[in-house]
C-alpha cells in the first residue's frame, strides 16, 4: 500500500492528548482520576455570551461570513487591540477571525515558512509549535531557557540561534508551560534582534489576560518598527472559558495578512457565524466574569505551588501568568519525567504532563494545570504527597 505524506509521518501525536486518552480509559474502568494534564477551565462560558449567541442563531446568524470575519467582531477586536495592547490595526485590513487561536498559528506558519527555513522557538514551549513548523517543512531551532535564569531570553542566547536561514521567531507570552511573562529587557532584545536580522515575529498571546503580576501586558507589535513584521495571535478559549467554541484571531500587517487569507479561504473558509457572535459578546459585554475567573486561578495557583513545594524533592517556579505550574522533580530520585508521570497516574491517580512534551531536554520537569476546580486540586495534591510518602517509606523498609 502507498504511504502517507512524509510531512505527516515525521511528526508525532500530541503527548497531552495521549495522557487525556489514558485518563479517559481509567475513568471508564471506574477509577477516580485527578486530571491536571490539560488547560481546560472548569468554568462554564459566561451566561451573557451564551444568551447573545443563541439569540444570534435564532435571528438567522447561521450562514457564511466573510473569510476575514464578521464586521462587528472585527471592529471589536481592533478596538480591543488599540485600547489594551496599543496596537493600531485596521479592522478590514489587519485582522482575520479564525476557528481557534491554534488555527491562526497554523495558517500563519504555513504562510511565512518555506521548506528549509528555520524558526527559533524558546524551549520549553507548547507542544504544537514544533509540529506546525515541521509540517511547513521548516526546521525548529531551540532557544534553551532555564529555571536558574527565570526562563528569561538573553541577547547572547537568542543571537546564537540566528543563521542565514532564520526567518521567524515564535514566542508565547505568558509562556506555556512555565508561566513566565516577558520582561522589558527581553522585549527590547527581541525587537532589536528581529530588526537587525529582518525576522518575522509571531506572538502567541492566548494567555494575555490571565496574569498574576501588576505590570500590564506588552505586545511586541506595539513596539517601534515592529508592527510591519509581527503577527499577533490570540483568542477566547482561556480567558473566557470558551475552549469548545473554537474561536481565535490574528493581527498582521496588510501585506502578510492578504497572503494568510489565502490559506484561510482554502482551508476552513471562515469561523462559524454564530460562534463569532459569542466572541463579540465577550468583547463588548461585562468583563467581570473574566476577572472573577482570574482571581480564582490565582488562588488555585498559590495553593498548588505551596503544596508542591512542601514535598521534599519538588521545586516550583511560581508562574506569573497562564494556567500551569512547571515543577522540577529531580530531587525526588524517582526517575525521569516520563517514568514519574506514569508512576503518578498508576499510584496517585493524578494525571500530569511530562516536561518532554515541551522540549526534549525537559526530562526532569512536569507540568500541572490549575485550570480545574479547587476541590480537584486539593485532592490531587493530597494524593501526590501521600503516594510519594508511601514510596519513600517502602524504600526505607527495603534498606533496613
Swiss-Prot record:
Chain positions with N6-(pyridoxal phosphate)lysine modification: 238
A GO term for molecular function: L-aspartate:2-oxoglutarate aminotransferase activity
EC id: 2.6.1.1
Transmembrane segments: none
Enzyme class at the top of the EC tree: transferase
Residues reported in the UniProt entry to bind L-aspartate: 37, 126, 176, 367
GO CC annotation, single: cytoplasm
Catalytic activity: L-aspartate + 2-oxoglutarate = oxaloacetate + L-glutamate
Any single GO BP term: amino acid metabolic process
General function of this protein: Catalyzes the reversible conversion of aspartate and 2-oxoglutarate to glutamate and oxaloacetate. Has very weak prephenate aminotransferase activity.
Membership in a protein family: Belongs to the class-I pyridoxal-phosphate-dependent aminotransferase family.
Name the record gives this protein: Aspartate aminotransferase
Organism: Musicola paradisiaca (strain Ech703) (Dickeya paradisiaca)
Amino acid at each position: 500500500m502507498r504511504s502517507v505524506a512524509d510531512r505527516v509521518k515525521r511528526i508525532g501525536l500530541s503527548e497531552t492528548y495521549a495522557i487525556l486518552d489514558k485518563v479517559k480509559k481509567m475513568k471508564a474502568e471506574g477509577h477516580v482520576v485527578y486530571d491536571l494534564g490539560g488547560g481546560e477551565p472548569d468554568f462554564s462560558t459566561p451566561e451573557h455570551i451564551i444568551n447573545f449567541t443563541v439569540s444570534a442563531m435564532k435571528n438567522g446568524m447561521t450562514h457564511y461570513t466573510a473569510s476575514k470575519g464578521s464586521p462587528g467582531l472585527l471592529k471589536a477586536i481592533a478596538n480591543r487591540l488599540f485600547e489594551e495592547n496599543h496596537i493600531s490595526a485596521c479592522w478590514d485590513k489587519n485582522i482575520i477571525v479564525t476557528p481557534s487561536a491554534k488555527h491562526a498559528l497554523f495558517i500563519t506558519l504555513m504562510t511565512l515558512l518555506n521548506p528549509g527555513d528555520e524558526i527559533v522557538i524558546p524551549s520549553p514551549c507548547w507542544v504544537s509549535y514544533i509540529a506546525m513548523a515541521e509540517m511547513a517543512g521548516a526546521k525548529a531551532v531551540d532557544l534553551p531557557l532555564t529555571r536558574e535564569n527565570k526562563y528569561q531570553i538573553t541577547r547572547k542566547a537568542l543571537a546564537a540561534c540566528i543563521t542565514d536561514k532564520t526567518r521567524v521567531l515564535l514566542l508565547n507570552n505568558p509562556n506555556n508551560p512555565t508561566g513566565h511573562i516577558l520582561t522589558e529587557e527581553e522585549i527590547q532584545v527581541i525587537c532589536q534582534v528581529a530588526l537587525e536580522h529582518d525576522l518575522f515575529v509571531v506572538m502567541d498571546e492566548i494567555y494575555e489576560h490571565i496574569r498574576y503580576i501588576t505590570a500590564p501586558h506588552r505586545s511586541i507589535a506595539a513596539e517601534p518598527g515592529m508592527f510591519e513584521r509581527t503577527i499577533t495571535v490570540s483568542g477566547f478559549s482561556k480567558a473566557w472559558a470558551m475552549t469548545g467554541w473554537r474561536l481565535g484571531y490574528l493581527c498582521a500587517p496588510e501585506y502578510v495578512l492578504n497572503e494568510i487569507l489565502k490559506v484561510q479561504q482554502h482551508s476552513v473558509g471562515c469561523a462559524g457565524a454564530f460562534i463569532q457572535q459569542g466572541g463579540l459578546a465577550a468583547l463588548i459585554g461585562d468583563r467581570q466574569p473574566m476577572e472573577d475567573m482570574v482571581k480564582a486561578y490565582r488562588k488555585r495557583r498559590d495553593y498548588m505551588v505551596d503544596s508542591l513545594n512542601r514535598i521534599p524533592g519538588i521545586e516550583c517556579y511560581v508562574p506569573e501568568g497562564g494556567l500551569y505550574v512547571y515543577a522540577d522533580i529531580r530531587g525526588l530520585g524517582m526517575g525521569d519525567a516520563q517514568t514519574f508521570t506514569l508512576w503518578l497516574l498508576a499510584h496517585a491517580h493524578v494525571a500530569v504532563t511530562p516536561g518532554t512534551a515541551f522540549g526534549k531536554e525537559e526530562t526532569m520537569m512536569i507540568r500541572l494545570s490549575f485550570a480545574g476546580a479547587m476541590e480537584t486540586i486539593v485532592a490531587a495534591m493530597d494524593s501526590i504527597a501521600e503516594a510519594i510518602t508511601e514510596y519513600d517509606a517502602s524504600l526505607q523498609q527495603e534498606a533496613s
